[in-house]
């Protein structure tokens, strides 16, 4: 019975992580340079932020988070988690 109580209390959401988790070294393997990582993450964070601002209006112009965000998690942290999980494809340009 105790096992069932523990499983019932587990969160169904991914644990939130900050800018140091995922580690920067892991993120740098996904792009060609640290500058490319900054631009890539910033663009995606802006899309996520725009999505949250327009979702109440019923406008779905932007794609929402591809990972389960925490209530107080910032768009940049969400974007970095998406990049680390290879949910986004980066193209140089």
Swiss-Prot record:
GO CC annotation: DNA-directed RNA polymerase complex
Q: Which reaction does it catalyse?
A: RNA(n) + a ribonucleoside 5'-triphosphate = RNA(n+1) + diphosphate
GO BP terms, alphabetized = DNA-templated transcription
List the EC numbers from the record: 2.7.7.6
Pfam families recorded: RNA_pol_Rpb6
UniProt-listed InterPro entries: DNA-dir_RNA_pol_omega (IPR003716), Pol_omega/Rpo6/RPB6 (IPR006110), RPB6/omega-like_sf (IPR036161)
Q: Which GO terms describe its molecular function?
A: DNA binding; DNA-directed RNA polymerase activity
The entry's keywords:
DNA-directed RNA polymerase, Nucleotidyltransferase, Transcription, Transferase
Describe, as the record does, how this protein assembles with itself and its partners.
Answer: The RNAP catalytic core consists of 2 alpha, 1 beta, 1 beta' and 1 omega subunit. When a sigma factor is associated with the core the holoenzyme is formed, which can initiate transcription.
What the record says about family reads: Belongs to the RNA polymerase subunit omega family.
Job description of the protein: Promotes RNA polymerase assembly. Latches the N- and C-terminal regions of the beta' subunit thereby facilitating its interaction with the beta and alpha subunits.
- Recorded protein name is DNA-directed RNA polymerase subunit omega
Organism phylogeny: Bacteria, Bacillati, Actinomycetota, Actinomycetes, Mycobacteriales
